[in-house]
Amino acid sequence: MSLKVLVIPEDPTYNGAILEPLIKRMLAECGKPQAKVLVLTDPKVNGFDHACARMVSIAERYAHFDFLLFLPDNDGQNRAVGLRRLEERVAQSGVRLLCCAAIEEVETWLLAGHRSKLQQDWRQVRQDVSVKENVFTPFLEQFGNRKESSGGRRRLMKEALRNYHSVTQLCPEIGDLEGRIKAGFAEIGT
């Protein structure tokens, strides 16, 4: 039986194009290269608050998945306590929800694999709460492709993942999520 993982982004079109290849690679690194990864599009959520408000109903609808991963932007907030509570609330229905907020935005994870192309110090990129507007948008204009459905995000993320271990070092929350997924494998016996 193949492992099934649902990725819940704040935006399935653009963030989903970054997160799907990342989670596939992460699961391969965890020894699950055949895992099925689905990005949530139904119901389509729009932003952090909307996703949180719908999470219990999403969990009920997708309870047949082995893991649900909610991967929002941190947006300069300290989301850890709220995300932990959300995990606990969903766990009451027997569903495994793991949350991981991208510091500061999901686009940062893509940028980590292209650090040599950036014109800024990496610490500044990581600390910029408007990294999408200040760093990622100019990067995408230069290296993306408007003709691609995701503007080039999927391709750029796949390129970034050639340096997966560097990405996990530059964005330690990704490594933490990987560790939590491995621990979850032990719980479900895979």
Describe the role of every protein-language-model region:
Residues 10:
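Phosphate-binding/switch region of NTP-binding enzymes
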Residues 1-5, 13-190:
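C-terminal accessory helical subdomains adjacent to catalytic cores in phosphodiester-
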